[in-house]
Amino acid sequence: GGFEIANSCRFDNLDGGSIIDYLTRTPSGASNRKTFTISYWMKRSALQGPTNNTLQQVIGQQASGYFRLTLGSNEQGDILRFYGGDGFEFRSKLFVRDTSAWYHIVLAMDTTQGTASNRAKLYVNGVQQTEFYTENYPGQNVDQAWNIAALHKIAAGTSSGPFCGYLAQVVNIDGAALAPTSFGEFDEDSGIWKPIDVSEL
């Protein structure tokens, strides 16, 4: 019983380096660029992109500045990598290599916070990530290149960096940095992190 996500989107981007499947959104105007939350469920179907050693961009905006949520296949393996303005960069030590598993990713941004470590928080399956290869936080009150009047992409970046896999319940919260419990919960019996209804957010 309980809530279940009805459908997911499959992105099959392994055809010789070309981006085949992706979604786009271009806001009519800018909104909150300091405080927002991005949440999505992800299941990988390939550990490499169409070429070796590429970033698979899951969600991002590169038309005006850049803000990218990616998967990196590099010397550090398949890890979560995030890039933004003012030197913001996370390279998590958590490996996401299991192509049979769903991962729930939450990135909560609030650059208005006085404490640097509160300006960006990364959660995977309900657990805040605190171990990073690279851990650089943005400056206070710095606008990010997100929620701007420019092309935002889901499952695509540059021609060599599309995402290969499934995405479900992709959510962008404008103006609030939310905890993962706004999007999921631990099952009382199994202890597994699972989705909840987000239609009221």
Can you name each region flagged by the protein language model?
Residues K34-S45, Q169-N172:
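Beta-rich globular "head" domains
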Residues G1-N7, L14-S18, G114-A116, K121, ...:
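Extended recognition patches within non-cytosolic domains
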Residues K34, Q48-L55, Q76, G114-N118, ...:
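Short loop/turn segments at connectors of secondary-structure elements within structured domains
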Residues Q61-L71, P195-L201:
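Short, intrinsically disordered, charge-balanced linker/junction segments flanking boundaries
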Residues F88, D143-L167:
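Extracellular glycan-interaction patches encoded by glycine-rich segments
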Residues I38-S39, G49-G65, L122, A155, ...:
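Aromatic-rich beta-strand patches that line glycan-recognition/binding surfaces
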Residues D12-F36, F88-V96, G157-S159, K194-E200:
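Short surface loop/edge beta-strand patches of beta-sandwich-type extracellular domains
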Residues G1-G16, S39-Q48, G65-N141:
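Extracellular glycan-interaction surfaces
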